[in-house]
Structures are given as C-alpha cells and as structure tokens.
Amino acid sequence: MAHQLDEHTLIAGQIAPADVAALAEQGVTMIINNRPDGEDAGQPTSAEIEAAARAAGIEYRHVPIARGMGPTDVEAMRDALHAAGDGRCFIYCRSGNRSALAWAVARSEDGVSRAELARCVGGAGFDLAPVSHLLRD
C-alpha cells in the first residue's frame, strides 16, 4: 500500500516487477529503490525492478540504504529526487519507513521545514524521531 508524502511523492514497501506497469498507469515517472540487494531472501533484485521500470518508460535509481543513514546516502537521495524534478516519484524499501525517513532528510537539506516534514511523514504513518538529529531547523 502506497502512502502519499507530498504532491509528487509516494512511499511503499517492497514491490515486484509485475507492479511497475500499474505505477506507470498512475503517472509515476521515477522509481527510487532504497533496498540493498540481498537484504531478504527472495526479494526482487535492483536489476529486475530497473528492467521493469525501463520497459514501462519509468526512470529508475538505486539508492541502497542499509543500517544507519550517512551523508553519502542523503546526497544520493537528494540527487535522485532532483532528477525526478516535478514528476511523480515512487520510493520503496522493505516497509516504507526507511524511504520516508531518507526522503525527509533529503528534503530537509533542500530547506523544507521540520514541521512540514513531520506533517508529511506523520500523515503517512511514520515517525521522524529516528532521524530528527539529521534534520535542519
């Protein structure tokens, strides 16, 4: 189940290659995958999701974030979000939580207020507390 974070961004847990065509029908123009390959047995690989995205005419970025979130993760996430521009972006990880938090930290770097990020992330059912120390004021 996807959660809307802002007018351009959807967050969800793991998807399958077969789900990508439906995302294209919903107007998604960029998929950002925050799962490292091999995180769980049987999960689709980045290459499998990328192939499905390309076949559906969707841009794809693999921004794997394992335990913790460092400056290079934040910068890669920002770059991917900037590449999406004003298009509709679908970001996923195992549950959606890591993606929501990575999105929030990246958007904080772009000047989005802590209050606005809390509203967006909280409205999707996630909590900013684990990354509050990374957010700009």
Q: What is each PLM-predicted segment?
A:
Residues 93:
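Short cysteine clusters
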Residues 1-90, 101-137:
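Cys-dependent protein tyrosine phosphatase-like superfamily
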Residues 96:
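Substrate/cofactor-recognition hotspot
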